[in-house]
Amino acid sequence: TPTMKEIDELMEAKPEIIALDATNRLRPGGVTLKEFYNAVRKEYPEQLLMADCSTLEEAVYADGLGFDFIGTTLVGYTEESKDVRIEQNDFALIREILNRVTHRVIAEGNINTPEKVHKVMGMGVYSVVVGTAITRPQAITREFVKALEK
C-alpha cells in the first residue's frame, strides 16, 4: 500500500487491517512514513494499521507513530536486514521488539513451521502470519526436494 490511491481502493473492501511498508525505503513522491501514516490516519481514523518492519529501529519508530500492530514482515527482505533471519539467536529480534514497543506485535516472515509458530506465540506476540509456507505449493515442494537432496 504505497499511496493513498491503494488505501482508498482497499477501504472499498472494508479491510480489518491495512499494512504499510514501515521501512526506510522511498515511497512514491518522496513521502515519508510519518507523512503517509498521518494522511491515512486523518482520512480513516478508525482503520487498524500494521507496520511492516525489517529492523528493530523501524519497529520502534512505527510504534512511536502509533501503528496498531508492529509486524516483522520484512525482516531479511531489505538492504538493512538482508543478513538477518527471524529465527536467529532464538528469535532475538522478536524478543527485542516485544521489549521495546507498546503496540501489539505480529510475527510474520519465515515463520514457516508449527514449531516456530509455537515458539513466537509463547514469547508473547499477538498473532502469527503463516504465508508462503501454506499458500505457495512450489515453495512447499522445494523444501521437500531440498530434504531429499541431502
Show the residue positions of the predicted features.
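Catalytic cores of alpha/beta
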Residues: 1-12, 54-68, 101-107, 111-130
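Active-site-adjacent beta->alpha loops and helix N-cap segments on the catalytic face
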Residues: 1-6, 22-42, 56-61, 78-98, ...
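Conserved beta-strand positions in the central sheet of alpha/beta enzyme cores
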Residues: 17-20, 50, 71, 129
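Short secondary-structure boundary segments
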Residues: 22, 53, 74-75, 109-110, ...
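Short, surface-exposed, charged loop/turn segments at secondary-structure junctions
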Residues: 34, 67-71
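Short beta-strand/loop segments at the ligand-binding rim of alpha/beta enzyme cores
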Residues: 41-51, 99-108
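Charged C-terminal helix
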Residues: 150
